[in-house]
A protein has these predicted regions:
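Extracellular/periplasmic solute-recognition and catalytic clefts
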Residues: 1-53, 64, 72, 76-77, ...
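Short, solvent-exposed loop/beta-turn-alpha elements that line the ligand-binding surface or hinge
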Residues: 25-42, 48-58, 95-116, 129-152, ...
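Amphipathic coiled-coil alpha-helices
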Residues: 120, 243-246, 250, 264, ...
Length: 320
């Protein structure tokens, strides 16, 4: 890709996210014939859960899994140092995140901790062996359900083939010895991306999978209410009940902010993010830093990827 820019086949490459490509581009910039822009992505990569069936229907399990993944190391490894960890469905480039940066820092970051994971599971009732006796301290934990049956703490994960994020999740989460030590097991099934989307959009309780990994971007204006509308096919997390309704209501409140009242909108946005951070229907994995690389003959090209993107910026740029 960078070779095309270097040879002049193209004049600009935008939203480059691969760490190796970014480093190659920065080396080219040092030679003096190219320039670049860098900005945070208005989106993120995540683990997405089904919240209406299996162990992940229980918030404590979702919390425990977050505690069992070193997200800081994961993000740095995957992005090659050109990315960061966020605490909800947002990107660092969004103006709301800049306005509420201090408050966002105060949200639960789910810092890696086996002890915290175990406490969440114990508080959530995962305190039994398969036969109903008190958990012995090794093996799979079980939770007693309202119907008297015992549910094993086994999560079924569907991932797409040839996916570097999935590969990293295998080593950093699925095969992490602390996952077993916590009394949890994650089974991985690998298939096509088409198959992944089929299961991802299936919010029936018969769906055999509860965990997926993929990425999402956010539009401008930021509107996610449709993704959390109870009973909607767009509600891929299938977050239901009072918790799901509350999250949806917060998203609607954000959308109904009076036009031009940026302060009220940003406050409503943060209220949504804070509740989302507690419900945790998804685990944010990384938010990339995008880079645009372009010939030094291109002038006045300025974008931030969200408030003012490349489709706008190119209209005001000029070539020597």
């Amino acid at each position: 890709m960078m070779d095309q820019l270097k040879t002049g086949a193209v004049d600009i490459l935008y939203q480059v996210a691969d760490g190796d490509q970014i480093e190659q581009g920065l080396d080219m910039v040092e030679d003096g014939s190219f320039n670049y822009l860098s900005y945070g992505r208005a989106g993120y990569g995540m683990i997405s859960f089904k919240c209406n069936q299996g162990p992940t229907q229980f918030k404590e399990v979702r919390h425990a899994m977050a505690y069992l993944l070193d997200r800081v190391t994961f993000a740095q490894t995957f992005t090659g140092g050109h990315g960061t960890v966020v605490s909800g469905p947002y990107g660092t480039q969004q103006w709301m995140a800049e306005e509420y940066a201090e408050e966002l820092d105060g949200l639960n970051s789910y810092t890696y901790s086996l002890d915290s994971a175990v406490k969440e599971l114990e508080d959530g009732g995962w305190v039994y062996n398969e036969d109903g006796s008190d958990y012995s301290g090794s093996g799979i934990r079980y939770k007693k359900l309202d119907d008297g049956t015992y549910m094993p703490l086994v999560i079924e994960w569907f991932s797409s083939e040839n996916n570097s994020v999935s590969d990293l999740l295998v080593t950093s989460l699925q095969q992490n010895p602390d996952v077993e030590a916590a009394g949890m097991k994650i089974n991985q099934t690998v298939g096509t991306f088409t198959d992944l989307l089929t299961y991802y959009y299936d919010s029936s309780k018969e769906n055999p999978y509860q965990m997926f990994n993929l990425a999402s971007g956010f539009g401008n204006p930021y509107d996610v209410a449709y993704q959390y509308e109870p009973g909607s096919s767009n509600n891929t997390n299938a977050l239901e009940g009072e918790e799901g309704q509350k999250l949806y209501d917060l998203a609607i409140t954000m959308n109904h902010t009076e036009e031009g009242d940026d302060e009220a909108y940003a406050k409503a946005w943060f209220d949504f993010i804070a509740d989302w951070n507690d419900e945790l229907p998804e685990i944010p994995l990384y938010s990339n830093d995008y880079h645009d690389f372009f010939t030094s003959k291109l002038h006045d090209f300025e974008e931030d990827g969200y408030n003012w993107d490349a489709t706008n910026a190119i209209l005001y740029a000029n070539m020597e």
